[in-house]
Structure formats: C-alpha cells, structure tokens
Amino acid sequence: KATGLIWDERCMWHNSGLYFGPQNTSPWIEPLPHIENVDTKRRIKNLLDASEVSRNLEVTEVEKATKNDILRVHTKNYFEEVLKVSNSGGGQLAKRSKLGSTFIGDLGIDIALIAAGGAITAAKNVLDGKLNNAYALIRPPGHHAEANEALGFCVFANAAIAGKYALDVRELDRIAFIDWDVHHGNGTQSIFWADSRAYTISIHQDNCFPPGSGKIEEIGG
C-alpha cells in the first residue's frame, strides 16, 4: 500500500484576495500579494513532480465535502454566511480582520468544500486500507477556522472536519491531531475542547498567532 497525495488543481484557484498585513483595507496602503497564495502550494506539487517523488505516491481524486460534513464542525449560521458572501461576488469573512484577513472569492465556497473534502478523502482512504498514509495538499487552509467564524486565511476547519468524519461516521474511539506550524492551531483546539475522543497537540511559536492563544495551560474542558 502506498502513500497517498490528495490533490485537486481547483484548490489552486482559491482567491485569497490582496494582503494589507495587520491593517484594514486603506487607499493609503499599497496591498501585497497575499502570503497564502497559490504559489506556496503549487511549488510543493512542482517539486514533488520535478524530483520524481510523485512516481512513488498514489495521487488520489478528491471527494467534495457535503454540507453535512461541514455542519459536524461549523455552525449553520457560519455556513450560511460563507455561502452568502461566496454567492454575492466574494469578500472578507473574518470578523476579527486584524487577526488575519480571510477572503473568499466569487463562488469560492465550492473550492472550500473541495479542500475540506480533500482532508476527508485522505482519512477515508487510510481507514479503508487503500493507503498507508496520505498528505492532503489543499487550500484554503483550515486550522485557524473556528466553529462559528473564519480566521487567519482559513475558511473551513479541514483537519477537524476529517476528524469528525472519523469519529462520527467511521466510529473511531480516539483520534489525535499533531499541528506543526509556527502558528497555534486554535481552531482545531477549540472545536474539540470538550470532546475527550480527540487529543490535540500544537507545536508553535509562543504568543505568535493568534496573539495570546496556545498557552501551555490550555488542556481542554
């Protein structure tokens, strides 16, 4: 059994908007290309192909997430907000915009559902015994998104959605998340805060992002 690469070119079409850093949009600040842009992920895929590592991977098609998949993690109100912004030409989602703008493009919810579905696809293929392990190369990212809001460029909490699939649909007893990123995986932590079936570990820089989040004393409810 192989290692799987979960890949869908449509994830590279996610529109993350322009980037103003910690500032709100302003006519006096020149925006930068967004730091969560397509090049960051496509470069990984290109390197896998150029180095021929891809030949040893099982490239697996994504099964798009359903509304029910999303609602295992996110509130109905938040899902409807994403749908409304997506169907109205796109725009900012994050209420706490100074803590990381989260933009979704016109009809961008379809891409966000593909990304969430990519995480589920990885879990499903491993649980079905088709793959030993899998890497989902997807965007928009997810570990900052909380149950009721976007944050830090993240629309849906992809890993948490895959975790809920494993627990609620496949009826696993216990799962664990190891989040290795300079930023705290606040979204995954908050979603499973009171769920003893999930163990969340975040390895991150202290007091980086979100500010004040991810202290060693945070051990669940």
Language model features with spans:
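HDAC/HDAC-like amidohydrolase catalytic core signature
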Residues: 1-221
